[in-house]
Amino acid sequence: MTNYPQLNKEIQDNEIKVAMHTNKGDMTFKLFPDIAPKTVENFVTHAKNGYYDGITFHRVINDFMIQGGDPTATGMGGESIYGGSFEDEFSLEAFNLYGALSMANAGPNTNGSQFFVVQMKEVPESMVNQLVDGGWPEPIAKAYADNGGTPWLDQKHTVFGQLIEGEATLEDIANTKVGAQDKPVHDVVIESIDVEDK
């Protein structure tokens, strides 16, 4: 049976728990090293080294996603721990459901340090029907129907984690006032990211 780790909030032995502290509250995620090993290692190493500390969510689109992880706050910056961009790690077990932690990119295999959290609360019914026809697994299509998400990003952005606590913080950030290029008028800052060691 295929495992869809995003469909439950329990942290399994093969998952990593991280707490993201922002100036608008905390968000807790579980990461999937079995599904996206290089992506998770990149994120965890950056988190432990303080790379993300003080970085903002530079692009916020309510009812779509919040994006951060760029030290330049322009959407053009950031690098991976591997010294350049690295390859996508797509899976048929992880999807861009509401609350998914996913890599931002500039096309195939251009992952660096930027990530986003999916915040779209409703997938149109017509699209949900297309998902089942298009080969999306039934439990995932149901999760999209029930909770929302951005299915058109599947197999285009690496999903490597899922929000398990702090939905109110995600919503608060998403509802922040933005100016040009969807940049928040008042900085939304990632103060630190704690990685829970097993």
Swiss-Prot record:
The PPIase cyclophilin-type domain, residue ranges: 14-195
Q: List the disulfide bonds.
A: none
What EC number is given for this enzyme?
5.2.1.8
Signal peptide start and end residues? none
What's a Gene Ontology MF term here? peptidyl-prolyl cis-trans isomerase activity
Broad EC category: isomerase
The family database entries (InterPro entries) matched by this protein are listed as:
Cyclophilin-like_dom_sf (IPR029000), Cyclophilin-type_PPIase (IPR024936), Cyclophilin-type_PPIase_dom (IPR002130), Cyclophilin_A-like (IPR044666)
What superkingdom does the record give?
A: Bacteria
One Pfam family this sequence matches: Pro_isomerase
Q: Which Gene3D superfamilies match?
A: Cyclophilin-like
Reaction(s) catalysed by this chain's protein: [protein]-peptidylproline (omega=180) = [protein]-peptidylproline (omega=0)
Which UniProt keywords are given for this protein, alphabetically ordered?
Answer: Isomerase, Rotamase
The UniProt function text for this chain reads: PPIases accelerate the folding of proteins. It catalyzes the cis-trans isomerization of proline imidic peptide bonds in oligopeptides.
Q: Which family does it belong to?
A: Belongs to the cyclophilin-type PPIase family.
This chain's protein is named Putative peptidyl-prolyl cis-trans isomerase
